[in-house]
Amino acid sequence: MFCVIYRSSKRDQTYLYVEKKDDFSRVPEDLMKGFGQPTLAMILPLDGRKKLVNADLEKVKQALTDQGYYLQLPPPPEDLLKQHLSAPGENKPDAKS
């Protein structure tokens, strides 16, 4: 099984996986409007030889079979302040001061 991966022209780090090149017939019209003009990113075999970066291989395969597409959204932004405040360390302000 292969999939064709397209990059969104409207949303950064958003990708659409479909089974066949330029076949968006099973993708909802509203999703395509929000996605913008698809730009071909790559064609990838789904046999497990190559690891997907931000998507689970089995979920992608299941979505392609069930609905004909898989939408990969960007990861949530890192909250560096929250990480800093929750990490133990010597450079934190003393609550007693």
Swiss-Prot record:
Disordered: annotated span: 74-97
Q: Identify the SUPFAM superfamilies for this entry.
A: YcgL-like (SSF160191)
Q: Which domain of life is it from?
A: Bacteria
The UniProt record lists the YcgL domain at: 1-85
User: Which Gene3D superfamilies does the record cross-reference, listed alphabetically?
Assistant: YcgL domain (3.10.510.20)
The protein's name: YcgL domain-containing protein CKO_01183
Q: Which organism is it from?
A: Citrobacter koseri (strain ATCC BAA-895 / CDC 4225-83 / SGSC4696)
